[in-house]
Amino acid sequence: RFRRLCPKVDVDLRMVDHALEPFELLQSGKTDVIFASRQKEPKCEWIPLYHELLYAILPKQYPLNGRKEFPLREFEGKDFLMPYGRFDIDVHAAFAKEGVRAKEQSVYVDDETVIRMVGKGLGISMMSELMIRGNTDDVLCIPVTPKSIRELGMGTEKGVELSESVRRLKECVVEYTSCLHGRTF
């Protein structure tokens, strides 16, 4: 839709190495718009777009005993494979609410590899629903309790008048995401 509304506007999409990098790029003027997970105090105009649950990623043989949720406290003392890319910010926020201290191992591999490592019994992990979609054949993925969410959104520079093309992009994204079925808590 945006391409139809603004056919002469180039959109440059970038992957970043960690969760704080989009905010750094925005603050340094290297980008006009970011899509990211909300951080404690985003120093930008922030528009919430989607809320996603955090899930425990467990080996298939993990003894759940019929439970449909995984208590955050059960991560305590367990070998925990920490996903790469500063996702630890979201994990630590969830752990802090319950005072959990897992035996964290930082792993510098992609999410799919972390899931495979869990499937091989090398530890357990926690990821958001968008991180695990389609990669769950060898593991159990169940929501953590108490419910923990991560807010995805769009940011623009604070206090700056948006260009016509950025304003239109913002409108298109808000309209598109309004029909997604994110979580409301």
Briefly describe each language-model feature range:
Residues 37-39, 60, 128-131, 152, ...:
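Short secondary-structure boundary segments
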Residues 140-185:
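A late-sequence structural motif
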Residues 64, 78-99, 162-170, 180-185:
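Secondary-structure junction motif
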Residues 45-55, 106, 125, 129-130, ...:
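Short beta-strand->loop
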Residues 43-54, 58-80, 163-164:
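Flexible hinge/capping segments at coil-to-helix
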Residues 1-41, 108:
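Central regulatory/effector-binding core of bacterial HTH transcription factors
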Residues 17-30, 86-140:
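Hydrophobic hinge/microswitch elements
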Residues 3, 45-48, 64, 71-73, ...:
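Short secondary-structure boundary/capping segments
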